[in-house]
């Protein structure tokens, strides 16, 4: 694997981590605090 390809892949991974981790944490806390009755 070339160094540029390795840098590209690592930037993709870090971009996904930076986007996905805070979003999932935020959704988790929102679902914990949002106690709406969703039964139909």
UniProtKB/Swiss-Prot annotation:
Keywords: Membrane, Photosynthesis, Photosystem II, Thylakoid, Transmembrane, Transmembrane helix. It comes from the Bacteria. Signal peptide: none annotated. The chain crosses the membrane at residues 8-28. GO terms for cellular component: photosystem II; plasma membrane-derived thylakoid membrane. It is a single-pass membrane protein. Gene3D superfamilies: Single helix bin (1.20.5.510). The keyword Nucleotide-binding does not apply. Its main location: membrane. The keyword Thylakoid applies. It is found in: Cellular thylakoid membrane. GO terms for biological process: photosynthesis. Belongs to the PsbX family. Type 1 subfamily. Involved in the binding and/or turnover of quinones at the Q(B) site of photosystem II (PSII). PSII is a light-driven water plastoquinone oxidoreductase, using light energy to abstract electrons from H(2)O, generating a proton gradient subsequently used for ATP formation. PSII is composed of 1 copy each of membrane proteins PsbA, PsbB, PsbC, PsbD, PsbE, PsbF, PsbH, PsbI, PsbJ, PsbK, PsbL, PsbM, PsbT, PsbX, PsbY, PsbZ, Psb30/Ycf12, peripheral proteins PsbO, CyanoQ (PsbQ), PsbU, PsbV and a large number of cofactors. It forms dimeric complexes. HAMAP family: PSII_PsbX_1. This is Photosystem II reaction center protein X.
């Amino acid at each position: 694997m070339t160094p540029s390809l390795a840098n590209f892949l690592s930037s993709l991974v870090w971009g996904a981590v930076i986007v996905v981790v805070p979003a999932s944490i935020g959704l988790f806390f929102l679902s914990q605090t949002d106690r709406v009755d969703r039964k139909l």
